[in-house]
């Protein structure tokens, strides 16, 4: 090797495609991991379903439900179910919590359509649900695609029923109508974010009337008759329901080489599953390992199941109390990775990316030093020390990684 090449290899940063670095054994392990990830996506279409599936997997790995004041020893595995919408898991370390914990945090809620409190109506002899979109959806992506309905309904007597329609092969599914091209001239002149108004995101439910020709609202009543027979639901019960409309279908491999996965919910279940797999592999950690599945990130992390609640502090604080440790001491010595998705460079939309500071497909996990928009507005900006620690950790353990921002400074954030 020439002196020039030696110097270039020593001084220049030259990321490489992961496929050029993977051994055959590593590639086989990666493919097995992706198959398990697809199962997670298929079983976790909503934040509630993610929690249920997480508990199912965790209990198979020896995790037990955490109870207040529970005495824990090194190696114990516990989970705390936060109202069925969030979950935290911990593997107790050999050091007490005064030395802190290593924490991974991701969210399992994804953009979707929620039903309004009084959603059911009929118009032009068809039955519909009114929706209120949750999080930052691209509205045009939600019309004319098959949809599923998942959630819970608390009935008038206080009992709760689970509703899951559209996920099984023989289930009916739902759809939101759009204009046909022949009548869409004026719609086509509108900006993309205005062409499909939020109030037009009405889910088509059916067009078969109730048998009695003399009753009013025959089509609405036909839907209620079905829901009452299957679930015991009346119209008033929608007021105390959490019903979510999500895209139908299972995760699928994409490409002749099956090198991509298409699915609803990558944001942020791709990170949630990674940290879950990580804590399942944690064996006799020195510091306690903690995994967080948070809810409500898409709308600001509010509410009792979001990260702005006291749920995480309660879980950590209660474990600290059993060890006689102050929660503040634990947090002062803890380390946390907040895991969420970013945007990989897409040549079809190259104008919104800073190519030199973008993530690229197959170049490894994307690390983002800061978030925010514009001039780092609202950013969480990691220090050089934190980035250096994570960078060294990745390199020392053979993890493929890359640094990334989300697009050009003025493009969004």
Where are these regions (language model features)?
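N-terminal hydrophobic/helix-forming segments and targeting peptides
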Residues: 1-413
